[in-house]
């Protein structure tokens, strides 16, 4: 009878300890979905206001407000504003005042053994990119852009766009939107610079399509990394010292009894 009571108390203590550790473990916040409320992607953390995608009140192809291909605002190829490749404004590639010009000075990454272990499983840490990792190759997503010309252009030129993305561990971000925002910016920037160095230039249509493609790939990468992060956390909880010792003690009592 005494052994039975001891075994029962040990079982209760084991379950309570395991549950307490599980609830206390840090997890990244999913953010409640794509672009829903609060300080969300796009445009988050943009000191120059011109990160992907361009900001403004207008939608795709509108004549005012910062949409794609507009004559005024922050769209692609504009003579004024902060879009890609503009002769005026503070947000273009390589310009001193824009947000993209700051990529040349990545912040010094902090050493974290958990991140290094995660990198070994997910991808190699890329040197010179502030601790970013390069994900595994993906099949380029099937995307419809709303018109036949862009759909056909994407099918014919998809090989020109990246099939891997750069990212940091998910536990460095508060939600999915922040992860995707950072992932899109660094991946597009790195691919554009590398390709331009080889003598190949991108058109306005290329840039629009590439960002949509990379965005979808970054969402997929976040989902993969989140799942792997939770699995690693569950394994660490299960095999941490207190639960293991209690479980072994309980099994010994049950066998002896």
From Swiss-Prot:
Stretches of Gly residues bias are at: 55-101
**Cited PROSITE patterns:** PRION_1 (PS00291), PRION_2 (PS00706)
Interaction with ADGRG6 as annotated region, ranges: 25-41
Q: Name one GO cellular component term.
A: plasma membrane
Q: Which residues form the propeptide?
A: 235-257
Q: Where is this region: 5 X 8 AA tandem repeats of P-H-G-G-G-W-G-Q?
A: 54-95
Q: Which residues bind Cu(2+) 1?
A: 64-66
Region: Interaction with GRB2, ERI3 and SYN1, residue numbers: 25-234
Q: Which cysteines are joined by disulfide bonds?
A: 183-218
Q: Which residues are glycosylated?
A: 185, 201
So which residues are the signal peptide here?
A: 1-24
Q: Which GO biological process entries does UniProt record here?
A: cellular response to amyloid-beta; cellular response to copper ion; cellular response to xenobiotic stimulus; intracellular signal transduction; learning or memory; negative regulation of activated T cell proliferation; negative regulation of amyloid-beta formation; negative regulation of apoptotic process
- InterPro entries xref list: Prion (IPR000817), Prion/Doppel_b-ribbon_dom_sf (IPR036924), Prion/Doppel_prot_b-ribbon_dom (IPR022416), Prion_copper_b_octapeptide (IPR020949), Prion_N (IPR025860)
Name the UniProt key words of this record, in alphabetical order: Amyloid, Cell membrane, Copper, Disulfide bond, Glycoprotein, Golgi apparatus, GPI-anchor, Lipoprotein, Membrane, Metal-binding, Prion, Repeat, Signal, Zinc
The UniProt annotation places Cu(2+) 3 binding at: 80-82
One of the entry's Gene Ontology molecular-function terms is: microtubule binding
Listed binding positions for Cu(2+) 2 are 72-74
Question: Which parts of the sequence are annotated with region: Disordered?
Answer: 27-114
What family is this protein classified in? Belongs to the prion family.
So which disease is it linked with? Answer: Found in high quantity in the brain of humans and animals infected with degenerative neurological diseases such as kuru, Creutzfeldt-Jakob disease (CJD), Gerstmann-Straussler syndrome (GSS), scrapie, bovine spongiform encephalopathy (BSE), transmissible mink encephalopathy (TME), etc.
Subunit structure as annotated in this protein's UniProt entry: Monomer and homodimer. Has a tendency to aggregate into amyloid fibrils containing a cross-beta spine, formed by a steric zipper of superposed beta-strands. Soluble oligomers may represent an intermediate stage on the path to fibril formation. Copper binding may promote oligomerization. Interacts with GRB2, APP, ERI3/PRNPIP and SYN1. Mislocalized cytosolically exposed PrP interacts with MGRN1; this interaction alters MGRN1 subcellular location and causes lysosomal enlargement. Interacts with APP. Interacts with KIAA1191. Interacts with ADGRG6.
What's the protein here called?
Major prion protein
What is the gene called?
A: PRNP
